[in-house]
Amino acid sequence: MVNIKIKILFILCCSLLFSEVKINVIESNDDHVIVEYIVNDFTTNLVSYENEVYNEIILNDEPRFIEQNKPQLPHINRSFIIPDFSSISVEVLSSNYSEYKNMNIVPSKGNIKRNIDINDVPYLKGDTYNKNAFFPASLYEVKDPYILRDFRGQVVQLNPFQFNPVTNVMKVYNKVVLKLTFDGTNSQNQFYRTLTSQKKITKDYSYMYMERFLNYTNDYRYTPVSEEGEMIVICYDDFCDEMSDFVDWKNQKGIKTTLVPKSTAGNSANAIKDYIENFYDNNDLVYVLFVGDKDQIP
C-alpha cells in the first residue's frame, strides 16, 4: 500500500511539473530581451461534422484564433515591459519545427456571444481554406503598446502552429528564440510621466506585474514598494456612519482608507469616474469600494 501511494504521488508531482509550453527569458536589459519558447506537447481531438472529420488543436492554458471560418489554431501571448516612448521590433534568432501531414484543422465559429448556444453554430470553411498558403502567415505578431499603472507594456504573440489547408500540412514550431529590441516606432500610448505619477509600486501591483510581464526583473522588483496601496470607500451618504468602524479598521491594518460620501464624489457616473481618476492621479490608489444599492450609486 505504501509503494502504491508513493507511485501515485510521484505521478501527480510529475504531471504538475510538466507544462506543454515553457518560456525562458535568456537575456534581459534596457535595450532588448531574448526569449525562448518551447512547445513540449499539444492535444489533438477529432471533431465530426456533416460527414467530415476535423482536427481540433489544443495547447493547454493558451488562447486560440477566433476569426470566424478560419483555422482555429492556438497561439501564445506574453507581455513585456517596454520604454515609455519606443516599442518592440522582433528578430527570429532560431527556430525548428515538425510537420504533420493529412491534417484538417477545424474552422473557428468566431467570437460567440453568451446568449447563443455554440452547438447551434455550424462549422464553415472560409476563403482561407482555398489558399495554398500557411495560416497564420507570420510566426509572430506584435500588438499595440498599452499602459498598466506603473509601466508601458506590449504583447508579443507567437504563432507556433501554422496550417496549409490545400496541402493539409500543419507546422508545429517546437522551439523558437526571439530577440525583442526596444527600437520600434509604434507611438501608441506613449507614457508621459509626471511628478505625481511617480508612485511607489504597491505590493498587490508588484504581484500582478510578476505574473504579467516576462521581463519584470529584479531591478523592478527591488523598486521601493509601499506596504499597501490606498483605498477609497464611496458611500451612499445615509450609510457613512455605519461604515466608520470599517474604515477605522482598514486604517489600523495599514491600508490608508478614505471615506467619501457619494454627494462629494458626484451625483452621476461620469462625475464619480472623474473623482476616482483625480484621486488616483494624486495618491497610491489600489482599491475602490462602493457602498449602496444600484439606485443609490449611479
Residue ranges and their predicted role:
Residues 4-17:
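Sec-dependent N-terminal signal peptides
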Residues 296-298:
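A short, glycine/acidic-enriched catalytic loop
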